[in-house]
């Protein structure tokens, strides 16, 4: 095994693209080495803003390649005595082997002569330039650029390539840039360039040059430094995984600095301050033990500790200016008030074919009112108030500057206007949930507004023909559908998907409602698959998925899944499957008990009627597992019927009546789920 080091040196790579680069380098290098028949023992990929580095252990040479070359049929190549003919000699010569090295193998309907050729692999060092070029060209990013007069495209201008194998320099070039055995240290803190004579020295040499090349090491340094600084002011860091990752890829040599801001800014909404620090400045906010924001924050710099005072002053000056801007917008919004903000939404176009934001609010009110009358009629007036103002903050200065605070600021403005807690919380939370794992709104009013908003969002874009296809979903319709399902599941509302979609009245006809229903069902099925239910299991409840409450569908699935694991499940399944197979190609027939001519028919009919009556109690209380166990008891009666009754009687009336009896039985057996679809 030999160690390889390949470094791509570039201008500052945007932090958001570095995780993509790391995954591509690892996956593509594995694929390329496999194609070159080189064994890959281990691989690590490091990254900083200025470099992407591959470290790997490879076999010293390619594996030999065997190739099978087909020749003529045996009877053409050899005579009856097995002696080679001219064609055998010609084929062997063409392949560079002796006749006695030819083999005979079956192919199609006969035996053919063939040659098995072995090609010895090259030394890894010989093919590495080609491999590394292919690796570089395989990297692809959403935004690529060209620079200078060359044709090379990359995420940022490439400045150098470093390539070593077994501590030997590998010389080649990519688009005129030659590889070296040199790298660059920190842009401002080190003397460049740096000679790398051994692969194992790479990290050590860079660390001395103020570059921590391993992102995991940088992350640990950031976490440790920041927590220690927060402890100095009796606080703790308000961690955010996305921010940690981003900051890790913004610096090569992390140095965390404790900063502060005036207490007066704590009068502003915490979310506003945190958004300014986190999203706009990439600073870490500090909270106390109760989770309240403190007037301190941590900035992670890309320089040495001796520059801390300058960093601190600069960060505090910037955050003060940002907070002043935020305060100005917030106070101006409060002066305008929620009523005026709502009025301003009349002038904001939601979509040229859908009207203004105010028009959207009116649609949300109407959908929310229908939902509320169905689910929480005693709170319909509060629902209408919340729905009326839920989009008002989109006309505010704060949300204009910080769009991620939509809803949250609306909640603050509603609270300031003296609205009930249920209402301002509903406005604040109505964008929730954004996915299956997110929290849903904390009260029913918020859930109703969220459902109404998401239903309108899906309906209007379906009306415009903007239906998601493939992986594309530019308007977040799948996310909206996921949110609807999540609320219906977690709140256990007695709403089916069909009834939920029926709450939409504007912009949709029955055909479009059907399309929307199918779309949401598909999202529900995807969710169920993601939670571990297999496709066949989900098929068993497909007859109910539109017409029964969402949470009930999940309970039915849980029951079938548990029931399937029983030891005696198989005998019931076979009985159900037999019934299903016999009736599946027939139209619906009318049942006439007077045509029964055997005791088995009468017994089965009487059992069905008895079970229908008793099963209702299980279904009504949603005891679906118990219902399946109860139906299981019918198995002997079903088997007895098939053992003694010929369904396909010569008399057409008798035959149809027996099929009608089995159709009647099938309806009963499918009361919980259609078990016949399992296999």
UniProtKB/Swiss-Prot annotation:
Catalytic reaction list: tRNA(Gly) + glycine + ATP = glycyl-tRNA(Gly) + AMP + diphosphate
EC number: 6.1.1.14
InterPro entries documented for this protein: DALR_anticod-bd (IPR008909), Gly-tRNA-synth_bsu (IPR015944), Gly-tRNA-synth_heterodimer (IPR006194), tRNAsynth_Ia_anticodon-bd (IPR009080)
Entries under Gene3D superfamilies matching the protein: Isoleucyl-tRNA Synthetase, Domain 1
Major localisation: cytoplasm
Keyword Cell cycle applies: no
Localization per Swiss-Prot or TrEMBL: Cytoplasm
BP GO terms, sorted: arginyl-tRNA aminoacylation; glycyl-tRNA aminoacylation
One GO cellular component term noted in the UniProt record for this chain: cytosol
Highest taxon of source: Bacteria
Subunit structure: Tetramer of two alpha and two beta subunits.
Protein name according to UniProt: Glycine--tRNA ligase beta subunit
Species classification: Bacteria, Pseudomonadati, Nitrospirota, Thermodesulfovibrionia, Thermodesulfovibrionales
């Amino acid at each position: 095994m030999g160690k390889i080091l390949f470094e791509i040196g570039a201008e500052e790579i945007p932090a958001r693209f570095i995780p993509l680069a790391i995954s591509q380098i690892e996956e593509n290098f594995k694929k390329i080495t496999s194609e070159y028949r080189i064994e890959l023992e281990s691989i690590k990929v490091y990254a900083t803003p200025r470099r992407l580095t591959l470290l790997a252990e490879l076999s010293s040479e390619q594996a030999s390649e065997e190739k099978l070359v087909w020749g003529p049929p045996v009877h053409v190549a050899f005579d009856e005595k097995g002696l080679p003919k001219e064609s055998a000699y010609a084929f062997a010569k063409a392949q560079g082997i002796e006749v006695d090295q030819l083999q005979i193998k079956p192919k199609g309907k006969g035996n053919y002569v063939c040659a098995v050729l072995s090609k010895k692999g090259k030394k890894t060092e010989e093919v590495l330039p080609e491999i590394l070029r292919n690796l570089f060209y395989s990297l692809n990013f959403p935004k690529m650029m060209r620079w200078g007069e060359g044709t090379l495209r990359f995420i940022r201008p490439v400045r150098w390539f470093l390539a070593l194998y077994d501590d030997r320099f590998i010389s080649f070039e990519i688009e005129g840039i030659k590889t070296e055995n040199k790298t660059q240290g920190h842009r401002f803190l080190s003397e460049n360039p740096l000679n790398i004579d051994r692969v194992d020295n790479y990290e050590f040499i860079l660390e001395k040059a103020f570059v921590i090349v391993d992102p995991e090491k940088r992350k640990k340094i950031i976490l440790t430094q920041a927590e220690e600084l927060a402890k100095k002011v009796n606080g703790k860091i308000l961690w955010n995984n996305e921010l940690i990752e981003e900051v890790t890829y913004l610096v090569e040599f992390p140095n965390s600095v404790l900063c502060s801001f005036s207490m007066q800014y704590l009068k502003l909404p915490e979310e506003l301050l945190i958004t300014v620090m986190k999203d706009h400045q990439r600073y870490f906010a500090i909270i106390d033990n109760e989770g309240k924001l403190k007037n301190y924050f941590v900035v992670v710099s890309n320089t040495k500790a001796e520059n801390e005072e300058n960093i601190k002053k600069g960060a505090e000056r910037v955050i003060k200016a940002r907070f002043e801007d935020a305060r100005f917008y917030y106070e101006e919004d409060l002066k305008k008030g929620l009523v005026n903000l709502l009025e301003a939404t009349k002038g904001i176009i939601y979509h040229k074919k859908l009207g203004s934001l105010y028009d959207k609010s009116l649609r949300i009110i109407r959908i929310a009112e229908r939902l509320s009358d169905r689910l929480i009629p005693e709170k319909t007036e509060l629902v209408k108030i919340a729905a009326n103002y839920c989009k008002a903050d989109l006309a505010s200065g704060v949300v204009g500057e910080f769009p991620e605070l939509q809803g949250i600021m609306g909640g603050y403005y509603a609270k300031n206007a003296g609205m009930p807690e249920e209402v301002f919380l509903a406005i604040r939370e109505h964008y929730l949930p954004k996915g299956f794992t997110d929290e849903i709104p904390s009260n029913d009013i918020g859930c109703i507004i969220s459902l109404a908003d998401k239903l309108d969002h899906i309906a209007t874009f379906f009306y415009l023909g903007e239906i998601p296809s493939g992986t594309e979903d530019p308007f977040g319709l799948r996310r909206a559908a996921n949110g609807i399902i999540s609320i219906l599941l977690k709140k256990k509302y007695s709403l089916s998907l069909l009834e939920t979609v029926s709450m939409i009245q504007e912009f949709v006809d029955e055909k479009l409602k059907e399309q929307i229903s199918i779309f949401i069902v598909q999202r529900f099925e995807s969710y169920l698959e993601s939670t571990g239910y297999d496709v066949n299991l989900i098929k068993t409840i497909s007859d109910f998925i539109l017409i029964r409450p969402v949470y009930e569908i999940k309970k039915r699935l849980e029951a079938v899944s548990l029931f399937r694991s029983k030891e005696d499940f198989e005998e019931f399944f076979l009985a159900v499957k037999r019934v299903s197979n016999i009736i599946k190609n027939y139209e619906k027939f009318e049942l006439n008990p007077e045509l029964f001519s055997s005791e088995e028919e009468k017994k089965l009919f009487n059992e069905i009627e008895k079970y229908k009556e008793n099963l209702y109690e299980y279904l009504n209380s949603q005891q679906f597992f118990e219902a399946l166990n109860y139906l299981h008891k019918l198995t002997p009666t079903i088997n007895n019927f098939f053992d003694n009754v010929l369904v396909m009687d010569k008399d057409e009336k008798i035959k149809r009546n027996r099929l009608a009896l089995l159709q009647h039985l099938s309806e009963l057996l499918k009361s919980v789920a259609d078990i016949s679809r399992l296999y």
